[in-house]
């Protein structure tokens, strides 16, 4: 069996695709091929997992009418031709789109070649690419029930977000490797300047018995490193965390954006969190994600307009100093966790491809 996956841009699109690819590779010994762009994190994350990847030229249109959109339109045309060539040569039994602009050309070309198609939408409110593709793909795997408001229900299957299986598998015995309270700070795979700026001030007078692992994002790392030297001994600064399963398991509290995959992994691991949703996203979907956890008593939410080093520190210490509240939030997060999404998407894909699964 051959499966082609299209995903690009940030880890939030790429990691779910990798989780799905592993299901097909492990259960069917399927031959896997990725399509991406050379500008996104797929150049690193996909190859790190040992999967082959081919690249096409594609970019997203600007919201305002600008001359640059003509260049992007030409790139899109070239991207469709490039994706079509890759698909004809690879001859997949199934094509799966997991988000990012690269999904459009790949899934569209597969449809034109009568190859079964499936897309996965990570957020409550689908992006433009998903809305367009949903008109002709065979199935749309969704992560939230509310997404049915935007896509024809006959096309959708509620699966949740595919997350790294190791997030769930880490046992309670493996979780605590530190004596003091531990905080994980992640601003997304590319980084979040506002979170980094706030943390740069916060760590200057943070209590010495609180251990902090702070992932700045690759494009922010060097700047943050220069601004915060010398760092307190209990603060570990890194550009990116590859073993996120271990990092989340080892934390008492996670400070993060509220992207769909981040939220899904926090819930699956059963961790209390302080969520700082990005306002710079379509339909403000991150705040929607964050508020869903807040309503269930699983997270504290701080919007950017409210964020200050003092407010974040007070919120954090309030949680760390109250173990009962921390444990309650952890239990509530765990209840919200949906696991088995990659397995379910694998089963849907097998049915679309007209094949029986090995399980």
Predicted regions span which residues?
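C-terminal alpha-helical cap of glycosyltransferases
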Residues: 338-359
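Active-site-proximal region of nucleotide-activated glycan assembly enzymes
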Residues: 31, 41, 52, 111-170
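Conserved nucleotide-sugar phosphate-binding/catalytic loop shared by glycosyltransferases and other
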Residues: 3-7, 30-75, 220, 305
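A short, well-ordered alpha-helix in the C-terminal region of glycosyltransferases
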Residues: 325-339
